[in-house]
């Protein structure tokens, strides 16, 4: 083993945070320094040249000064016996660089802890707990001890459970020791069947059975027979959900049987490379819509980052594994937790009810979990466009007196939509003899028993079992697998995939039997053919672990060669682990121990284990009405704006890429001031169309504490009032996902669940014409623990989260909440679907005063709700609405405030028509919406509303002005008069506090201060050219298409939109993978232009873009090709984002690039996804010809974009050379260091450079993601199809005239 030092691992503010944690624990720690340590496992000693190469490879990140660390050494490494995602990617790079003696690289962090007095062993243990994650890491006292990382354990054997002599008792004991969560009747079933087989079951067979038949996988409660209050019920819960499909099957192509549901989409030109020529072009066909929403609650409670991350990853795999291959497109993430209690910012309603030690508190879940979910989506390359966040934790009246209701077991929801070809919607037959394949990463000893663990209330299983059941993520591996799936579906009728499933709960022990069972086959499997990174695992651990980023597929023998070639090109590992058999029998052979760990008929595993019967009793609680004592209106406004459910969510949004794909038409951030208040998410179906897809969410979970049915109806209703803001047409085009969370078995909750499912499945959805073709349930939403001898529990309310998906006719018609001050005289109209009832039960107002109230909002009239949707659709289509915002949490007050924030304007409202009770009028959460309309169209709008049955509930409630005043009157009385800016700042406090705790606090403070500036003019545009002129048109007309190499490396994810931009400018865009160059399948000589695209090459493990660059620099043949290309004078090159970082590291090969800087971690130390204003500088770049002085917004999405120069002289030399091409500017047009206008902290606001001759340009922002006007989060009126950044690509074409 060789040890190589790396760069410092912690910035100053990260060190300060650790010191603060030490102080809180009364530790005498005075200083902490940390640096990365690299460990190389070698097959032979390295010669001097190879050692130098390895040292260069492991030099990445910010440049460091020499430093000799002092203090107690604590070395944190991945857990011995595991291989971290960092290791597998870094080892890949080393081998691609020709370092064949490097068997494996691994990285640890060496912490040096200084203290005023010697630390005791107890104190050292506390420090260890602060600096490492016990789930995935170990701590050593010296560097040499890291050799344990490379030790190889001997395989452990399987064990048997002796039921032949020990009977049922033996199985009962195994049920506890293995954490199987088997029900009594399942134990009987297994004893009976193995006795019939005349043999004892192996541990692996029992674990496989437990996973496959867990509540998590089998949905026993949803399939159960029910008796309520002594009356047998005619339908199961699942049957009532299916009723929505039976009554409205319209537009549904696949429901209830696959990994995601499918509905009809639009006919568009899908843009992808031809499988033979690899040239990108449009393929005119149906792009049907995939939809799926998952929950990952249990893992997120135990370990939030990996829990949320693998939640998003699993849902992405569900979409890819639909039919015989789908394409994930846009994501959503949502969280419900108990109260945050932010230190120093605790709110009056946030009582501390305690929690068990093994789960994480709500604050830490929300500091870590969202980062995990965002990081997976970012690295995979899926924009995250939607979400919600609710906190609830309160002592409420119950049938037993009082009980605490809340979300100690959080809800972590991950969902999304994608597209699929018409001919791929249904799975094919699995031929006998088909290869059964595991595609993706290796098996590791993690995530054991996740399905069974998720099926228990938090706190019921032993702590080490809880920790065993969380997984870890490697999104770059999943991206490679998806690229394989993409290549397969792009072959059309020649798609080699016959059948595909993702690997989720239960690992391959669930996925492989499910694969062959669904294909009506059996399977013969070889355990030792499963790719395995931990040789010491027992057969049970190899078969049942939940290592992520894996799919199982069936491929016919004659298609294996084509499949193998695709996997090799994409560098996606796979293994044939079995063969499909005619006989429906499952056999697993173990060549190492020469035995057969599994040998059982399929019907014992997946046959008909006993069906559950639920007996339930209805319990209704009389909750007292809200008392108004002590509620003062101004204070109520402030409290509600600070409630996390209502408050600004920027800290959850800017961490997630919202522009990747170049198809995003509506993200969360709205208007020139980029305020996060969008009603729904919208994507374009392709680059040649305005058809698209939309998704929205609805949930009103606290209402279930008063009325189960109302809570469910409101969730459906809110998803509709959110999605009504875009152009859908017929309501039957909308399909819903229903995610049900319940503390099953808790008194009254089972009957409540039945009531809620019936309310939507049998009543509301059929009445509206809505279908629920997909969903999921999580039935153990309760946390129990013992505190000082006292039994405690926190029980979640019944929680239905609805996600609505729809085909969109014209994405340009989507309306946002941004109030418009540039449209003449206008009015605000409230459509109140509560019809003046103004019920306050379970509202934000009740919550912030620690109350629940008695009567909640409800959907009293389904016909009126449908009339509302139809009216809004007519108005959206006729362009009659200037702004639209649904009414939800916080009521009318919050709706108006958010509209004013987005429009940066004043509101003057009068609520006299809404009744005398001001609090109830402003804070009720009845469904509805506020729209802004031009006064000269007001009558026409009101008559459309009246024609749809809404006349009595539509009220003109006021107007707007270009001031900072937020005024609400009731008749002549002013009831509220506030500064809009002051309200905006209160609304932002929660996001500021969370950002300051999680990211660089200096950056969080700057962003918060900027929100106080009422004079901020917002984003604006000033162009030196005519945006709607196509200067490439004359060259395109001649028919010659210069060849453009669209270059990608494993983990790159922005290549398709880049190809689309160059294609539109008249280039022949060709898909080139680095593996094509390294294997000689592609040569750069043939191309005029080269673009290195954005993403996360190798998951950014050796510095962003640095691993990719070094695989060129250290490979003689690749180096020669690139050098020759850059030196050819008739070529040009572009590097964007990851490609910018990569080309900056190739500067020794690029003439005139010698002054280029490096790009390192953002000053905020966070991935930044922003829509930032930049100015094009005067330079010789061929891309920016005629654009100097132009100022316009652009997509920014990166974690390592800060320019790093050697010193002041280097910076001065760059400025003097005339090679600065693009700078960040503030909204007044001045280059800025202020965050977030300068999102990465680059000196002199530099974010793009060129070479001295202008042939090679690099930039961190993404012009290719906003080349269409519709893909800009905000654009001025008057831009046509092409956005301002299309000019760059047209310039490149003109340059080759």
Curated annotation (Swiss-Prot):
Its main location: cytoplasm. The keyword Nucleotide-binding applies. One of its GO terms (cellular component) is cytoplasm. Mg(2+) binds at residues 718, 722, 886. Pathway: Purine metabolism; IMP biosynthesis via de novo pathway; 5-amino-1-(5-phospho-D-ribosyl)imidazole from N(2)-formyl-N(1)-(5-phospho-D-ribosyl)glycinamide: step 1/2. It comes from the Bacteria. Residues 1044-1297 form the Glutamine amidotransferase type-1 domain. One of its GO terms (biological process) is 'de novo' IMP biosynthetic process. It is found in: Cytoplasm. Its EC number is 6.3.5.3. InterPro entries: Class_I_gatase-like, FGAR-AT_N, FGAR-AT_PurM_N-like, PurL_large, PurL_linker, PurM-like_C_dom, PurM-like_C_sf, PurM-like_N_sf. It catalyses: N(2)-formyl-N(1)-(5-phospho-beta-D-ribosyl)glycinamide + L-glutamine + ATP + H2O = 2-formamido-N(1)-(5-O-phospho-beta-D-ribosyl)acetamidine + L-glutamate + ADP + phosphate + H(+). ATP binds at residues 307-318, 678. Signal peptide: none annotated. Keywords: ATP-binding, Cytoplasm, Glutamine amidotransferase, Ligase, Magnesium, Metal-binding, Nucleotide-binding, Purine biosynthesis. In the N-terminal section; belongs to the FGAMS family. Phosphoribosylformylglycinamidine synthase involved in the purines biosynthetic pathway. Catalyzes the ATP-dependent conversion of formylglycinamide ribonucleotide (FGAR) and glutamine to yield formylglycinamidine ribonucleotide (FGAM) and glutamate. Monomer. PANTHER family: PHOSPHORIBOSYLFORMYLGLYCINAMIDINE SYNTHASE. This is Phosphoribosylformylglycinamidine synthase. The lineage of its organism: Bacteria, Pseudomonadati, Pseudomonadota, Gammaproteobacteria, Vibrionales. The gene is purL.
